[in-house]
Each structure stands twice: as structure tokens, then as C-alpha cells.
Amino acid sequence: MPKETPGVSLGIHESQSRIFENQIGRSRQFTRWLFKKMKSYFGEFGIRDEEEFYRLVNKVETGFIRTEADEVHYNLHIMLRFELEVEVIGKNLEVPDLPEAWNSKFKEYFDRDVEKSSDGVLQDVHWSIGAFGYFPTYTLGNLNAGCLFEKMQKDIPGLADGFEKGDVSLATTWLAENIHQHGSLYEPGDLIKKATGKDFTPEPFLNYLDEKFSDIYEI
């Protein structure tokens, strides 16, 4: 019997961390709680109030480092890496030429000049350990997270009220019931449809970004 491909993908795995990092961790409600907690430990630390803290956590600006990127720019960092991977795997780009190709593409996407490789092609561990093709799972994770969080909010009225108290138990319970308990039983698209009642689509994630940052920047 041939071994079947495992069902759930790394794009689903990444969606779980992205939900907690972004939709929950960068929410106005959770950052309000976090600001108070930090102030109780550190006293004054140069940030005026909860609203300023929230806006700083969600500040949109171009930067060199993927792991420090805001939610708006993050997927551009992934696209850059993915396009270079395609070129390398397709033997259209040699490894010694990667730094120059990276810097050129970064300039095109972010309009900034990379001055050192630690801010560019050498900033991630993935390629050095042979993890080619992993980067797209982060964007897939973002898109899956958008689908799941949209449904979570509809299923749990007042979900964000708990975040303001540092309580994420309603979110973890919903994910346990709708995602975790199924393990690798379903293919990603089937799992998303089972959890949300809808086919996978980028729309919930795009709507989330539009609503959130339109509010922050009053646009």
C-alpha cells in the first residue's frame, strides 16, 4: 500500500501561531491588557497610554527583517523569498548570485537598500538548514487564520472581551474543537470548510487588514 500524503499542512499549523500573534496578540483589547501588565512590572517605560501602545505595536513601516515586519508588509517579505526559491530550484539563479538578486528585489518591493547580508539574504535559518519551500506556509497561515478568526468571532459573541483581561481560553477552546481535535484527518481546504462552513478564500484576511488599519490610520 502506498503511503498517503498527510492531510493537514504546515499552512494550517502556521495559522494557529499567526492567530495568537496577530489577530489576538496585536488586537486593541489584548494590547490594552498587556500595556497594564507591563506597566505594573516596569513602571513608566516611555509609552504614554494604551492607545499609543496599540498603535506602536501595529505601526506600518518598511523594514529589513521579516520577523519584525508589520502585518501589512509581512507577506511581501514572503513573496520575495518565494520568488527567489523558484528561481534557484528552476536553476535560473545560482546560489552565489542570491545576495545580489535579493538586494535588487528588496529595492523593488520596499524601496530600501540592503547594506549588510544579516539584514538581507542571511537573516533567516530556513535555507541554511535546507528548508526550501517553507516560507509560503507563513502566508498560507495568515490566510487560513483570516478564515478561522472570522468564524470564531461570529461563533463567540464578546470574544475580545476576554482578551482585555488576558484571557484567550475561548479562542483556544474553539480552535481545539474545530481544528486540533481532527489532527491530520482532513486536507487543508476540507478542514477550513468544516471549521468555517465556507471554502478557503483570502477575503477574510484582506477584510481584517482593511478594517484594522483603516481604523488605526483613519483612512
Region roles according to the model:
Residues T5-F45:
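Post-HExxH zinc-binding segment in Zn-dependent metallohydrolases
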Residues I78, F82-I219:
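C-terminal, non-catalytic "cap/extension" segments appended to globular domains
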Residues E4, V8, Q23, S40-G43, ...:
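Generic detector of intrinsically disordered, low-complexity, polar/charged segments
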Residues K36-E44, R55-T62, V95-F106:
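Short low-complexity stretches enriched in small and charged residues
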Residues E4, V8-G11, E71, S128, ...:
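Short, solvent-exposed segments of well-ordered alpha helices
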Residues Y41-G63, T67-L80, E85, R112-V114:
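All-alpha helical catalytic cores of prenyl diphosphate-utilizing isoprenoid enzymes
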Residues M1-P2, P6, K59-I65, V121-G130:
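Acidic/His metal-coordination segments adjacent to aromatic residues that form catalytic metal sites
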Residues R26-F30, R48-F53, E94-D97, E187:
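General structural signal for secondary-structure boundaries
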